[in-house]
A protein has these predicted regions:
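Pre-ATPase regulatory/linker segments immediately N-terminal to the P-loop/RecA-like helicase/translocase core
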Residues: 1-3
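Conserved helicase motor core of SF1/SF2 NTP-dependent helicases
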Residues: 5-32, 36-146, 150-235
């Protein structure tokens, strides 16, 4: 049964989205991600495979299709370093700005300018906040992007998934090689959660797993070489 949930968004203007030279693997991802029966996609891949870019692109397309009202970008506030920076001065927005930069960068790349990205934020068509703010919320008609999910616990991922209401679509993105949390298993909660939802029953409920490999790295040939070398080394 196809999802017929349609957003009555008072903002009628279409978003002009830059079209990039997508690979066949990326087009395959779009076919799954944008399918009306798809609800959740666990996306695995090393650095440089454009996981955030592709999910953001899908969110923008879904807004143009009037299937969602807005994009919500979430991350766990975990630093990508073995040493914490400790207390940082400033407002909550100031402190979270650096965690949100990957999403803002992808928005600007797809929209063509910082001004156009800011306009979407002003119209409340995009929002960004940490995972621990999600509890108690109910998300209907939204595209949820949980980025760097290898740094999320099972409880955090469960919290995000169980916020989903009618008409929402969720992308859970992770690179298990880049786990920065110390208090859970080596790969955080993502690997366990994605395995739980990798069966036929999950597919019947619109829950998919999609994997990019080092062969799909687009950032640079150097990064592709580095990731391939690290994979072979077993480090």
């Amino acid at each position: 049964i196809q999802n017929e949930f349609v957003i009555e968004n008072p903002i009628k203007r279409l978003i002009k989205i830059n079209q990039l030279p997508w690979t066949e693997k990326q087009k395959e991802f779009f076919r799954i991600a944008l399918h009306p029966d798809t609800n959740i996609v666990f996306v695995t891949g090393p650095a440089g495979t454009a996981k955030t870019l592709l999910s953001t692109y899908c969110g923008l397309q879904l807004m143009n299709m009037k299937l969602i009202s807005d994009i919500m970008y979430l991350r766990s506030a975990v630093e990508s370093s073995d040493q914490s920076l400790g207390f940082l001065p400033g407002t909550a927005d100031d402190k979270l700005k650096f965690f949100n930069m990957p999403f803002v960068d992808k928005l600007e790349e797809l929209l063509g300018s910082e001004k156009r990205a800011e306009k979407l934020s002003e119209e409340k068509r995009v929002s960004m906040f940490p995972v621990n703010f999600a509890r108690g919320m109910n998300w209907s008609g939204k595209c949820i992007i949980l980025d760097e999910a290898q740094n999320s616990t099972i409880k955090e991922i469960t919290t995000v998934l169980t916020r989903m209401g009618k008409g929402s679509k969720c992308f859970i993105l992770a690179d298990p090689m880049q786990t920065d949390i110390r208090h859970e298993a080596k790969h955080g909660g993502f690997v366990k959660m994605s395995k739980v939802f990798s069966d036929e029953e999950s597919l019947e409920h619109g829950v998919y797993n999609f994997e990019f490999t080092h062969e799909d790295i687009m950032r640079s040939e150097l990064v592709k070489f580095l990731i391939g070398k690290l994979n072979k080394s077993g480090l």
